[in-house]
C-alpha cells in the first residue's frame, strides 16, 4: 500500500496542466455502446483507476476496448454482439457502472446490471434512473442484488420530470432516449458541463439532443449511431483543486486548461475571499495574499457550488480568519473528512448538514486517512500548509479521480512524496 508524505510550508509556484474530466469520460465511454457502426476514439482521457474499471465493464459486455494510457486515448468498437449483463465484480467498484443500463436498453431492449458501489458518501439512490426507464416503457425489477430491465417493443419517447436534477439519471435517460422511437423531453435535469459534453458526443455520433446545460433537454430518437472521435473536456474539479493548492500556500501558479465557464460559483467564492484569478484563453493565473477573508459556502446542484469541491474549500477556509459555515445540501454523510482535519488541529465542528470553522487554524502534521476521493485531495492540501509532516493513507480513493497528483504538486515546489509502506 502507498501513502503520501508531505512536509508543509512550501509556497507553490509554476505551471500545471489539467487532465480530461473523470466525470465526463465515464458517461462518454458508456455512451460508446450506443454506436452500432464503426468505432469511437476518445482522446484527452485521464489515466485513472475508474477509467480502467469502466473499460473492463465495456469489455465484459463484449465491446472491443483498446486503452493507450501514454496517448490518453481509448478505442471502443461496440458494433459487436453485445452482452446484456454488467456483473457485480466491476459495478461494485464504481457507481458510474450503472450508466451502461441506458445504452444496453437502447441497443438490446434488455439489461441486467448489479446494484452499484463507489464512494461511501450517502445513499445516492438510483430511483431517478429507474423512473426514467419506466417512463420510456421499460419494465424494471430488482432481484438478488441485480436490476433487471426489459422492453417488449423497444423504448418510446415521452415526457419525464426528475424529482431532483440527478447527474447520473440525466445521463442515463439521455442515452436510453437517443435510440428510442419519437421525442423525449426531460425536465429538471442536471446542468453540469459533463452533461453538455455527453450530449455533444451523442450528437457527433448522429444523435439529436438539444438543451443540454439548461433545465430541459429534448431528445429526438434516431435509428442508429456511429462511432466518432471525441475529445474529453478538462476536469473542472481537478482545476478547482489545483487553484486551491495555489491559494492555500499563498502561491503563484498558472493552471493550464482551467475553463472559467465551468467554475463560476467556485470562482465567485474564491474572489470573495481575496484570491486573485487572472483568466486567460488557455487557463488561469492564481495568486493569493496572506490574509484571506471568511466566507460561507452552500453546496448546490450545478451551477451552484459543487459538492465535489466542498472538502477542498474547507481546507482553504481553515487558513482564513473569522467564522465560516459550510452547508452540504447535495449528499448526506459528506463530512467524514472533518474528523481527519481535527487530527491536524483544525478548529471545526459538524452540526447536522453544516460544518462550522472558528478562526484561523494552526494546522499541524498528523497521520490521516482519506475517507473518499475529494477528501483525499483536501487532506493533502491541508498538509501543504501544516506545520511538520502529514501522512495521508487510503490512496485508492485519490487514484480514482486524480492523475499523479503528488507529482503535479511536487513540480510546483511542494515537499511531497508517495511511498510504499
Swiss-Prot record:
Which Pfam families does UniProt cross-reference here? Answer: EPSP_synthase
- Predominant subcellular localization, coarse grouping: cytoplasm
- Tell me, what does this protein do in biology? Cell wall formation. Adds enolpyruvyl to UDP-N-acetylglucosamine.
Listed SUPFAM superfamilies: EPT/RTPC-like
Any Gene Ontology biological process: cell division
Q: Which UniProt keywords apply?
A: Cell cycle, Cell division, Cell shape, Cell wall biogenesis/degradation, Cytoplasm, Peptidoglycan synthesis, Pyruvate, Transferase
Q: Which pathway does UniProt place it in?
A: Cell wall biogenesis; peptidoglycan biosynthesis
Q: Which domain of life is it from?
A: Bacteria
Positions of modified residues (2-(S-cysteinyl)pyruvic acid O-phosphothioketal): 119
Protein name per its UniProtKB record: UDP-N-acetylglucosamine 1-carboxyvinyltransferase 2
Organism whose genome encodes this protein: Staphylococcus haemolyticus (strain JCSC1435)
Q: Which residues form the signal peptide?
A: none
Instruction: Give yes or no: UniProt keyword Acetylation.
Output: no
Any single GO molecular-function term of the entry would be:
UDP-N-acetylglucosamine 1-carboxyvinyltransferase activity
Q: Where in the cell is it found?
A: Cytoplasm
Please give the InterPro entries that the UniProt record associates with this protein: Enolpyruvate_Tfrase_dom, Enolpyruvate_Tfrase_sf, MurA_subfamily, RNA3'P_cycl/enolpyr_Trfase_a/b, UDP_GlcNAc_COvinyl_MurA
Which positions in this protein are listed as binding UDP-N-acetyl-alpha-D-glucosamine? 95, 124-128, 308, 330
Family affiliation: Belongs to the EPSP synthase family. MurA subfamily.
Reaction catalysed by this enzyme: phosphoenolpyruvate + UDP-N-acetyl-alpha-D-glucosamine = UDP-N-acetyl-3-O-(1-carboxyvinyl)-alpha-D-glucosamine + phosphate
Q: Name one GO cellular component term.
A: cytoplasm
The residues that hold phosphoenolpyruvate are 22-23
Q: Which NCBIfam families match?
A: murA, PRK09369.1
Give the organism's phylogenetic lineage: Bacteria, Bacillati, Bacillota, Bacilli, Bacillales
Catalytic site positions? 119
Q: Does the keyword Cell cycle apply?
A: yes
Amino acid at each position: 500500500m502507498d501513502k503520501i508524505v508531505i512536509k508543509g510550508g512550501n509556497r507553490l509556484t509554476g505551471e500545471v496542466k489539467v487532465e480530461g474530466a473523470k466525470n465526463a469520460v465515464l458517461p462518454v465511454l458508456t455512451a460508446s455502446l450506443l454506436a452500432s457502426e464503426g468505432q469511437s476514439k476518445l482522446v484527452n482521457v485521464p489515466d485513472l483507476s475508474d477509467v480502467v474499471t469502466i473499460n473492463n465493464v465495456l469489455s465484459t459486455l463484449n465491446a472491443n476496448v483498446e486503452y493507450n494510457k501514454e496517448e490518453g486515448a481509448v478505442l471502443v468498437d461496440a458494433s459487436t454482439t453485445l452482452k446484456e449483463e454488467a456483473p457485480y465484480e466491476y459495478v461494485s467498484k464504481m457507481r458510474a457502472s450503472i450508466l451502461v443500463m441506458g445504452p444496453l436498453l437502447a441497443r438490446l431492449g434488455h439489461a441486467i446490471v448489479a446494484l452499484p458501489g463507489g464512494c461511501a458518501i450517502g445513499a445516492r439512490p438510483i430511483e431517478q434512473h429507474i423512473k426514467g426507464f419506466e417512463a420510456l416503457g421499460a419494465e424494471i425489477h430488482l432481484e438478488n442484488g441485480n436490476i433487471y430491465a426489459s422492453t417488449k417493443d423497444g423504448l418510446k419517447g415521452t415526457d419525464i420530470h426528475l424529482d431532483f436534477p440527478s447527474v447520473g439519471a440525466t445521463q442515463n435517460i439521455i442515452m436510453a432516449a437517443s435510440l428510442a422511437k419519437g421525442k423525449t423531453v426531460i425536465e429538471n435535469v442536471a446542468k453540469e458541463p459533463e452533461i453538455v459534453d455527453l450530449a455533444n458526443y451523442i450528437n457527433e455520433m448522429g444523435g439529436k439532443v438539444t438543451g443540454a446545460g439548461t433545465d430541459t433537454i429534448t431528445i429526438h430518437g434516431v435509428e442508429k449511431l456511429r462511432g466518432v472521435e471525441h475529445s474529453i473536456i478538462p476536469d473542472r474539479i481537478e482545476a478547482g483543486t489545483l487553484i486551491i493548492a495555489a491559494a492555500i500556500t499563498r502561491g503563484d501558479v498558472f493552471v493550464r486548461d482551467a475553463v472559467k465557464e465551468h467554475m463560476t460559483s467556485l470562482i465567485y467564492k474564491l474572489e470573495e475571499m481575496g484570491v486573485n484569478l487572472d483568466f486567460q484563453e488557455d487557463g488561469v493565473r492564481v495568486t493569493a495574499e496572506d490574509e484571506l477573508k471568511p466566507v460561507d459556502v452552500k453546496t448546490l446542484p450545478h451551477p451552484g457550488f459543487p459538492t465535489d469541491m466542498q472538502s477542498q474549500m474547507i481546507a482553504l477556509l481553515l487558513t482564513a480568519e473569522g467564522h465560516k459555515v459550510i452547508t452540504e445540501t447535495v449528499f448526506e454523510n459528506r463530512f467524514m473528512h472533518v474528523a481527519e482535519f481535527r487530527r491536524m488541529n483544525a478548529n471545526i465542528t459538524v452540526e447536522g448538514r453544516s460544518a462550522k470553522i472558528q478562526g484561523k487554524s494552526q494546522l499541524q502534521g498528523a497521520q490521516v486517512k482519506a475517507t473518499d476521493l475529494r477528501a483525499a485531495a483536501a487532506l493533502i492540501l491541508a498538509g501543504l500548509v501544516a506545520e511538520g509532516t502529514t501522512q495521508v493513507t487510503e490512496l485508492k480513493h485519490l487514484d480514482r479521480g486524480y492523475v499523479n497528483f503528488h507529482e503535479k504538486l511536487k513540480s510546483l515546489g511542494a515537499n511531497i512524496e508517495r511511498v510504499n509502506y
